[in-house]
Swiss-Prot record:
The keyword rRNA-binding applies. This is Large ribosomal subunit protein uL3. GO terms for biological process: translation. One of the primary rRNA binding proteins, it binds directly near the 3'-end of the 23S rRNA, where it nucleates assembly of the 50S subunit. The gene is rplC. The keyword Ribosomal protein applies. Keywords: Ribonucleoprotein, Ribosomal protein, RNA-binding, rRNA-binding. It comes from Kocuria rhizophila (strain ATCC 9341 / DSM 348 / NBRC 103217 / DC2201). GO terms for cellular component: cytosolic large ribosomal subunit.
Length: 218
């Protein structure tokens, strides 16, 4: 049995340009992240009769056609659009209202709208437990010898004497998919295809993020 998705979701792919601050109507500084969301286009539509669910596929970002595989080139040609570097699929109940090749602009959202932003966090490489998990480490004195940043016991001295799955240890930090939820769109600049979103977004400058309708406000 297929569960249908009965919620309208709007979404755009964009490039994170960085953070700045603007004034609100009360003259207070508001920290915002600027996202440039141009060249979004509908590349595929899905429906319950054929696919078992309703969804819209969005393409974003230019790419050299010579670098696109033949199957993907045919996929974009069927939609009547030029090849795009990034593609994302959004499940939404109103997918039938979209058209193949339709261009989507930042006017999809309005000031004050609540959104979730999905991105890839900054990669930090291999990190210890103090940086990665916020451990306190070991004391600086009182006999501590070259143990200052170590995690301490990982469970071998207790019962059962083994290390459980999920034990917080040193390892690769960052470069992971992350969703920041329930953010507010502060302003929309349709002329320059810019979204000003209050607060910080995951990822470095120049990274691609997905701005979509929030699930908490549904």
């Amino acid at each position: 049995m297929t569960t249908t998705f009965e919620r309208q979701v709007k979404g755009l792919l964009g490039t994170k340009l960085g953070m700045t601050q603007v004034w609100d109507e009360n003259g207070k500084f508001v920290p915002v992240t600027v996202v440039k969301a141009d060249s979004n286009v509908v590349t595929q539509l899905r429906n319950t009769d054929k696919d078992g669910y309703n969804a819209v596929q969005i393409g974003f970002g230019a790419i050299d056609p010579r670098k696109v595989t033949k199957p993907l080139a045919g996929h974009f040609a069927a939609a009547g659009v030029t090849p795009r570097r990034h593609v994302v699929e959004l499940r939404t109940s109103d997918a039938a209202e979209y058209e193949l090749g339709q261009e989507l602009s930042v006017e999809l959202f309005e000031a004050g709208a609540k959104v979730d932003v999905v991105g890839t966090t900054k990669g930090k490489g291999t990190a210890g437990v103090m940086k990665r998990h916020g451990f306190s480490g070991v004391g600086a004195s009182h006999g501590a010898h070259k143990n200052h940043r170590k995690p301490g016991s990982i469970g071998g001295a207790s019962y059962p004497a083994r290390v459980f799955k999920g034990m917080r240890m040193a390892g690769r930090m960052g470069n992971a998919r992350h969703t920041t939820m329930n953010l507010t769109v502060h302003a929309v600049d349709a002329e320059n295809s810019l979204l000003l979103i209050k607060g910080a977004l995951p990822g470095p400058k120049g990274s691609v993020v997905l701005v979509r309708s929030t699930v908490k406000g549904a």
